[in-house]
Design a protein with these regions (language model features):
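Charged/polar, solvent-exposed surface patches and flexible loops
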Residues: 11, 26, 61, 65, ...
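Gly/Ser/Thr-rich helix-start
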Residues: 20, 56, 102
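A solvent-exposed, acidic/Ser-Thr-rich amphipathic alpha-helical stretch
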Residues: 29-84
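Hydrophobic pocket/interface hotspot
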Residues: 9, 24, 32, 55, ...
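Short, flexible active-site loop motifs that bind/organize anionic cofactors or intermediates
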Residues: 11-14, 49, 121
Length: 137
């Protein structure tokens, strides 16, 4: 199962890198949950992404918000690890918030839970503070 999950995960990153959001969504379950909340999550924070996103419509909203508020400078998954139902990616990303012109970068770990070849849960771990500061004027 872990080899199959790694193959799915590779497809997801390829779709994201190519800007193929419908293709990326095709690997998400209907009950998908993306947990993009920081440790100090507060509703209405300066970061419009900091939220719990549910369902494909929520993921679409997240992706639209991400792609209209930030530019990708670098997005590099470096290592992947898998077990029966999870895949973890370790990597580095570098972004620019369009409105403020501020850049931020961070190493990341992303934990994906899969069921029957579809992602049911996603949780990134990175420097949320750096991202939040980049959104501030």
């Amino acid at each position: 199962m872990s080899d199959r999950n790694l193959a799915v995960f590779t497809q997801i990153f390829e779709r994201f890198s190519a800007g193929d959001m419908p293709g990326l969504l095709s690997f998400q379950s209907d009950e998908i949950v993306w947990d993009y909340r920081s440790e100090d999550f507060t509703e209405g924070m300066d970061n419009p992404l900091n939220n719990l996103w549910k369902g494909k419509s929520g993921i679409t909203q997240f992706l639209n918000t991400l792609l209209t508020t930030q530019e990708v400078i670098e997005f590099e998954p470096r290592d992947f690890f898998a077990n029966e139902d999870q895949v973890v990616a370790i990597g580095h990303s570098h972004w620019k918030v369009i409105e403020t012109g501020k850049e931020w970068a961070s190493d990341f770990a992303m934990v994906f839970t899969l069921k029957e070849g579809l992602v049911t849960h996603w949780r990134p771990i990175f420097d949320y503070t750096a991202e939040r500061i980049a959104y501030q004027s």
